[in-house]
UniProtKB/Swiss-Prot annotation:
Span list, region Disordered: 1-114, 132-177, 190-252
Family: Belongs to the BCLAF1/THRAP3 family.
Top-level division of the source organism's lineage: Eukaryota
Protein name, UniProt field: BCLAF1 and THRAP3 family member 3
Major location (coarse): mitochondrion
Annotated disulfide bonds: none
Compartments where located: Mitochondrion
Keywords tagged on the record: Isopeptide bond, Mitochondrion, Phosphoprotein, Ubl conjugation
Upper lineage: Eukaryota, Metazoa, Chordata, Craniata, Vertebrata
Length: 752
């Protein structure tokens, strides 16, 4: 199908439907648009249409004339004048409207992917609906002449008053006034009927919503200097509603009323005779039309009266955009309620006032949720002050008159506006005295709490503490204070306790005294080998604790002093000692648990006498002998220059800190210092045995080094017999010898 070849950057058609336009659509829209035959045959505006077109900025030099290119694309494509659009209105899709700012088909094809979601749904209703020879955006020649050639200031030669429609190549047929009226009546009726059919199939319109407009608006990106495109470009859902409600703002603004009074429908005929409003007489001369038809036709002129949108949009695009407005207003389409579109034609005629005033009321409630221009207009600033910044005063007068024109279809527009103004303060005014009972104290700020306290000062009661006055005054000053409620709770608790829980006659002191006396009486009868789990004295006095009993604890008849075995405080310690004893039995020797804790003052002097005459160190731990040859007394060589008496005690301290009880036997045996308790012969023999034993177990992990080995061998050769104690070398070798002797003695005793 042929498409328009217009290459103007400002004239790019874009439609919501994937199907191209054909002539029947434009023919019917032509007879229903601004510059239809009714408008040109109007006797009251023979010359004002040129002024109006020039005023709307269509003759701007930045809009190049396109008369020749347009007619060249539609040569030999004019349809027959006998074709009537009513025959195929059952398949007409009301969503096929032209959006101003969309451009020709070449631009529409450029942005077609944005409508892929709605393409399949519209194909079945749009295919084979119109004559396929002329497709795309086609506007009658007189539209083109005004919209392109010389700023719509030249009246097309094809139209003259009283003449029948005339056909020429590349130009649409022009019909008489009666035919135009008949076409418009049928068009409105069928349009509403098909809109109902389509919206029943698609209760929510698949068109782009307002959320898509901000990110998918190519005109804002391509022509950022045209600020009006943000409001009216592409007529997406949001800008269309913004423009629609913006035009009604002066009806609700009190400052607008003295300048633009909204007269009844018949009284405004003389006012419209002026040049700025002359092109809207067509509708007013046919009041016999149905209310729904008037509603659709009224809102068709909405964008035409705004010069800031007409300055940037040619006539043809504005023509198609008004069809979108008819479809919206015929079904009372609010921006947030698209699902309410399913209105029948009969219902639309019955509720004419609702169709006209419904959007006003919705805007009064939801003015904040709409476009930002609505918020600015609702700020009690006259709309003409804002528009005077962009257009002349003549345009403002035309727009103001067109505002009043929209209200003419309602019976009493002044009463509607005043009723809305009276309702508005009710939504703003708040009765704080009533809302106090529904809000908690935590929701109020400090200032609001103070204000409520001041108001409720006279209502406060005197039966509660002043601390709670601030909290209770905001909610209910007559309520009982918090402390009284707490006191009642406490009283109930005491009452229940006195009734249900009888206190015993015996005190705690008496009860524990009885237990103590009974245990003291039975203490002598307690067996020594009784189970501690059943016979434990948990209330042992200090005297009993200090009283120690002697008993046979080990099978080898080792006499130890122990405390009462049934005492719970010593049970854990006793078990720990037994566990350590069992571990030692697996190694070499079984020792008494008291022998391990030699540091205890109670057991420091306990001794066991062996048959060989040697005293057994009570604090000696019997463990693996190899542990004693792994890096033992390395500090002996570091302290050889010290005095012997100081060195012995220092070595004792270092070894007790480093190895625990492993080296504690060297200098203290049985709690007393005994360095020379053996004879000289015994010491020599033990030294030799310890030396060879050390050399036997010396290895890479041992404590013996070559230095010590060489020294010991040299000392052995030079001194076959130990020298006297006054020899200086003896003082140097004595720590090592004493260490060797002690280790040898330990080894011998363990070996036996």
């Amino acid at each position: 199908m042929a498409r328009s070849r217009s290459r103007s950057p400002r004239w790019k058609q874009r439609s919501l439907s994937p199907q191209s336009r054909n002539f029947e659509y434009h023919e019917e829209r032509h007879f229903h648009g601004h510059y239809d035959p009714e408008y040109r045959h109007d006797q009251q505006r023979p010359f004002t249409w040129r002024m109006d077109d020039e005023k709307h900025g269509q003759n701007k030099p930045r809009i190049p004339p396109r008369v020749n290119s347009y007619h060249r694309s539609y040569v030999n494509r004019s349809p027959s004048p006998n074709v009537k659009p009513v025959e195929k209105f059952d398949t007409y899709k009301p969503h096929q409207e032209y959006f101003p700012g969309r451009g020709d088909d070449d631009r529409r094809s450029q942005y077609m992917p944005t409508y892929t979601e709605s393409a399949a749904t519209y194909m079945e209703h749009e295919r084979d609906c119109y004559i396929p020879t002329v497709q795309g955006r086609y506007t009658p020649d007189d539209h083109r002449g005004r919209g392109r050639g010389s700023g719509r200031g030249e009246k097309p030669p094809q139209m003259s008053l009283g003449k029948p429609p005339k056909m020429s190549l590349g130009k649409p047929p022009q019909m008489s006034l009666a035919d135009s009226l008949r076409f418009k009546e049928k068009w409105h009726e069928d349009e509403l009927r098909h809109q109902r059919v389509q919206e029943e199939s698609y209760p929510q319109s698949p068109r782009r919503g307002s959320e898509d407009f901000g990110t998918r608006n190519p005109f804002q990106k391509r022509y950022p200097e045209d600020h009006d495109f943000r409001k009216y470009g592409y007529t997406s859902k949001r800008p269309t509603d913004a423009a629609r409600y913006e035009n009604r703002d002066p009806a609700r603004i009190p400052k607008w009323k003295p300048e633009h009074s909204f007269l009844p429908f018949q009284e405004k005929k003389e006012e419209w005779s002026f040049g700025a409003q002359g092109h809207r007489y067509t509708e007013r001369e046919y009041p016999e039309r149905s209310s729904t038809t008037r509603v659709s036709y009224d809102y068709r002129h909405k964008h035409h009266k705004l010069s800031e949108s007409e300055q940037d949009f040619p006539d043809g695009r504005f023509h198609k955009h008004l069809k979108e407005e008819d479809r919206k207003y015929s079904s009372i389409k609010a921006p947030a309620n698209r699902e309410l579109d399913c209105f029948s034609t009969t219902r639309g005629r019955e509720i004419e006032n609702e169709q006209i005033n419904g959007p006003f009321y919705l805007y009064n409630k939801n003015s904040v949720s709409y476009n930002h221009t609505n918020i600015k207009d609702a700020d009690l600033e006259p709309c003409n002050d804002k528009w005077k910044k962009k257009i002349s005063k003549e345009d403002c007068r035309k727009e103001n008159a067109s505002f009043s024109k929209q209200f003419d279809t309602s019976p009493k527009p002044e009463e509607k506006c005043y009723s809305l103004i009276k309702k508005k303060p009710l939504s703003v005014k708040v009765d704080r005295n009533k809302t106090d009972t529904f809000r908690s104290t935590s929701r109020y700020s400090a200032e609001r709490q103070i204000s409520h306290d001041l108001v409720a000062i006279g209502k406060t009661s005197d039966n509660f503490h002043p601390v709670f006055q601030h909290l209770d005054s905001t909610q209910n000053p007559e309520n009982k204070p918090t402390e009284e409620f707490a006191q009642e709770i406490i009283t109930l608790i005491h009452k229940v306790k006195a009734d249900s829980f009888v206190t015993p006659d015996i005190t705690l002191n008496e009860r524990f005294s009885r237990i103590k006396n009974r245990q003291d009486a039975d203490f002598n009868q307690t067996k020594s080998n009784s189970d501690p789990e059943f016979h434990r004295r948990i209330d042992m006095s200090l005297d009993d604790f200090q009283n120690k009993y002697t008993m046979v604890y080990e099978p080898d008849k080792t006499l130890v002093k122990v405390i009462e075995p049934n005492d719970l405080r010593h049970d854990i310690e006793r078990r720990r000692k037994e566990r350590l004893q069992n571990e030692d039995e697996n190694i070499f020797h079984m020792a008494s648990p008291t022998e391990r804790n030699h540091q205890s003052p109670s057991f420091s002097k306990v001794k066991t006498i062996r048959a060989d005459g040697f005293q057994k160190p009570p604090h000696f731990i019997k463990s693996n002998f190899r542990k004693f040859i792994q890096k033992p007394y390395i500090n002996y060589t570091m302290q050889r220059k010290d005095a012997i008496d100081q060195k012995i005690f220092r070595v004792e301290e270092n070894h007790q800190n480093r190895r625990g009880s492993k080296g504690s036997f060297k200098n203290f045996l049985g709690g007393r210092f005994q360095p020379h308790y053996k004879s000289h012969l015994v010491q020599k023999s033990m030294y030799i045995q310890a030396k060879y034993q050390r050399l036997r177990f010396a290895g890479p992990r041992g404590f013996i080094t070559n230095k010590f080995r060489n020294r010991f061998l040299r000392k052995k050769k030079e001194y076959p017999v130990l020298p006297r104690t006054n020899n200086l070398e003896l003082l140097q070798v004595e720590p090592t010898l004493y260490e060797d002797l002690t280790e040898h003695l330990i080894f011998v005793r363990n070996w036996n």
